[in-house]
């Protein structure tokens, strides 16, 4: 018989608001004496076809159809009666039960947002009762790993936004700083902050817009990626650092090209640049091999160390070409390509379509499946990047996941907007707790790069 203090006594879900002003699911999971843990679920703007289903109400009279009362009700009336009474340390058993209660391959019945809220809250409750921080509970109790050396993640900081995350003329979604030359997480955050403010002053001096996108980066109207990357080089240098893959600050891109892809024609169209007449109709349309050449050219001109979703999620042939041409010097990250799904990741490993996986807990919907995906990637020698979503909350669980599972990289927005900063502050707190046991890997986190 398990210890009664670990017995789940009550579960309640309710609507809260995310950083874009839309509802999302929160869940509280209670043990005895009123002890509880809470989790809030994020939401994406550009979503992959294979993502687990985020259940929305569709009632146009309420939150423009984006309410989540159906998902909340599924927690309170379907999940809670089955999970109440279970031991909160039985993470895998609870997650598998919720998956079976749903019964669909993509969690379409109950909603991944319903299932994930409970899954994360269960882990947080068990950690609390064990009197451990969540990252230690994940490693020691869920993974059964007693090692006591901890890898802090190198952050990817989104400083220029475009694509679906901003109302501007840039077709690519994210341009990011990576402080690879820092000696600690705290120093990485300081370097990133200084470069961020340096970029802001440069944009102002050039009379460019300093409004922010969903993830806290700037959203100026620029002609192309070259302009954005030149500004980033200037910002790093003005802040007193050296841009470079082997220097202080490297760059990462997330163009989110699935948003640009025409599956029938198998071409990519730079729609924003075309609409703004920055590119001609001929130059705005590219084939897979053209895109790979384009990325190759940018990587030769700028210190780009990582490209996420450089091709569309269904363009596996294109990804194989990209890995062949760029994979030894650039981290090729699959986001929409894999949707944090362990089965798809394993197929991708066998076909060599990337060398890194983006990890978004709400793409798959349980902590157990998230861990399975990370384990599969690490076993193949691939890297993992734990990621936020464009619609976030002040929940900091992903910071603990990144440390607990030694992913070595995290992508959680810019140096503005408190729902992003919350994750950095949690990482600083973890690094302070760990002291000399914390290791910041810098460039060595990129295992595939020679």
From Swiss-Prot:
GO biological process: glycolytic process
SMART domains, alphabetized: Enolase_C, Enolase_N
Annotated binding of Mg(2+), by residue: 254, 308, 335
Pathway assignment: Carbohydrate degradation; glycolysis; pyruvate from D-glyceraldehyde 3-phosphate: step 4/5
Protein name (record): Enolase
CDD domains linked: enolase
InterPro entries (alphabetical): Enolase, Enolase-like_C_sf, Enolase-like_N, Enolase_C, Enolase_CS, Enolase_N
Presence of the UniProt keyword Lyase in the record: yes
Catalytic residues (UniProt): 215 (proton donor), 360 (proton acceptor)
GO function terms (MF aspect): magnesium ion binding; phosphopyruvate hydratase activity
Signal peptide coordinates: none
Stored SUPFAM superfamilies: Enolase C-terminal domain-like, Enolase N-terminal domain-like
């Amino acid at each position: 018989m398990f210890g009664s203090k670990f017995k789940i006594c009550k579960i309640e879900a309710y609507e809260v608001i995310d950083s874009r002003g839309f509802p999302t699911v929160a869940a509280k999971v209670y043990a005895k004496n009123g002890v509880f843990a809470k989790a809030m679920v994020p939401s994406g703007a550009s979503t992959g076809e294979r993502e687990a289903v985020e259940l929305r109400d569709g009632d146009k009279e309420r939150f423009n159809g984006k309410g989540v009362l159906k998902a909340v009700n599924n927690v309170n009336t379907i999940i809670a009666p089955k999970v109440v009474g279970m031991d909160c340390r039985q993470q895998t058993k609870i997650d598998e039960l919720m998956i079976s209660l749903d019964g669909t391959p993509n969690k379409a019945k109950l909603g991944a947002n319903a299932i994930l809220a409970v899954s994360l809250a269960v882990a947080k409750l068990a950690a609390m009762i064990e009197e451990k921080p969540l990252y230690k509970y994940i490693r020691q109790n869920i993974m059964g790993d007693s090692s006591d050396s901890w890898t802090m993640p190198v952050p990817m900081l989104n400083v220029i936004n475009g694509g679906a995350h901003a109302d501007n003329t840039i077709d690519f979604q994210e341009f990011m700083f990576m402080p690879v030359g820092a000696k600690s997480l705290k120093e990485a955050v300081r370097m990133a902050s200084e470069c961020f403010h340096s970029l802001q002053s440069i944009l102002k001096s050039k009379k460019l817009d300093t409004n922010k996108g969903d993830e806290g980066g700037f959203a100026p109207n620029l002609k192309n990626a070259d302009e954005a990357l030149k500004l980033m080089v200037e910002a790093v240098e003005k802040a007193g650092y050296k841009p470079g893959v082997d220097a202080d600050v490297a760059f990462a891109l997330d163009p989110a090209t699935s948003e640009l892809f025409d599956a029938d024609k198998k071409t990519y169209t730079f729609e924003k640049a075309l609409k703004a007449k920055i590119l001609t109709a001929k130059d705005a349309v590219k084939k897979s091999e053209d895109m790979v050449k384009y990325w190759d050219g940018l990587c030769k001109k700028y210190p780009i160390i990582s490209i996420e979703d450089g091709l569309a999620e269904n363009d596996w042939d294109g990804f194989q070409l990209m890995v062949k041409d760029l994979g030894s010097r650039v981290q090729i990250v699959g986001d929409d390509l894999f949707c944090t799904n362990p089965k798809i990741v394993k197929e991708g490993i066998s076909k060599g379509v990337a060398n890194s996986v983006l990890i978004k807990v709400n793409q798959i919907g349980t902590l157990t499946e998230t861990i399975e995906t990370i384990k599969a990637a690490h076993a193949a020698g691939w890297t993992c990047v734990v990621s936020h979503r464009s619609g976030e909350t002040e929940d900091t669980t992903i910071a603990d996941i990144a440390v607990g599972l030694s992913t070595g990289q995290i992508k959680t927005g810019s140096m503005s907007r408190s729902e992003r900063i919350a994750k950095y502050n949690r990482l600083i707190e973890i690094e302070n707790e760990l002291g000399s046991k914390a290791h910041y890997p810098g460039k060595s986190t990129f295992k595939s790069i020679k």
